[in-house]
C-alpha cells in the first residue's frame, strides 16, 4: 500500500522539517502542502531538504497566468503538483500547469474539488486522456448523499465509466 498524506498547511516553517523527518519513518509516497501557501522561500527549502517528496496543492490556487506559474515552479521546485481543474482554470489551465511542471521534471496528479458526479465525470474522462501513471484523487463522488447517478463506479482502486449504462437525464434530476 502506498500512502499520501496532506498537512493542509498545518506545519509551521520552523518545525516542518523535523515533522517531515519523523513522518519519513512511515515510507510515505508524499505529503501535500506541509506549510501554509504563500511562503515560497520556506517551501523551496523544505522541497530541497525533505526526506520524501512534497506535493503542492493550495499553493497553486489563484495563480492563473503562465509567468507566475513558471515563477512558482522554478522558485519552489516541488516534486509534485496536484491539480483541481475546477480551481485552476479548467482543463486548459490544468494542462498548462502539467506542461510547465513536466518541462521542469515535476510530476503531477489530478484530484477533484468535491464536484458533483457531473463535474467528476468530466474531470475523470479528461484525466484518462492524460494516460496517468500515478493514482489520481477522483473517488469523491460517493461522499455526497444527494448526488446524481452517473455511470461512474469504483472497482478495486480504479474509477470506471461504464458506457453501457445510460447517462441520467440531468434536467429531470434538477427539477426533482
PLM regions and their residue ranges:
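Catalytic core of soluble alpha/beta enzymes
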Residues: 1-121, 125, 144-155
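Flexible C-terminal active-site loop/helix
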Residues: 113-176
Amino acid at each position: 500500500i502506498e500512502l499520501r498524506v496532506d498537512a493542509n498547511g498545518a506545519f509551521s516553517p520552523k518545525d516542518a522539517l523535523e515533522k517531515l523527518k519523523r513522518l519519513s519513518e512511515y515510507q510515505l509516497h508524499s505529503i501535500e502542502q506541509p506549510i501554509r501557501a504563500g511562503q515560497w522561500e520556506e517551501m523551496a527549502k523544505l522541497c530541497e531538504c525533505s526526506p520524501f517528496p512534497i506535493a503542492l496543492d493550495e499553493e497553486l490556487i489563484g495563480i492563473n497566468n503562465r509567468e507566475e506559474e513558471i515563477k512558482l515552479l522554478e522558485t519552489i521546485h516541488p516534486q509534485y503538483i496536484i491539480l483541481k481543474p475546477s480551481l485552476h482554470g479548467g482543463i486548459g489551465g490544468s494542462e498548462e500547469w502539467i506542461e510547465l511542471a513536466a518541462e521542469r521534471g515535476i510530476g503531477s496528479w489530478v484530484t477533484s474539488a468535491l464536484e458533483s458526479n457531473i463535474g467528476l465525470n468530466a474531470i475523470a474522462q479528461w484525466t484518462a486522456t492524460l494516460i496517468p501513471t500515478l493514482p489520481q484523487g477522483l473517488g469523491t463522488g460517493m461522499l455526497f448523499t444527494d448526488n446524481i447517478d452517473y455511470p461512474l463506479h469504483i472497482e478495486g482502486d480504479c474509477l470506471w465509466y461504464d458506457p453501457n449504462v445510460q447517462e441520467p437525464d440531468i434536467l429531470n434530476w434538477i427539477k426533482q
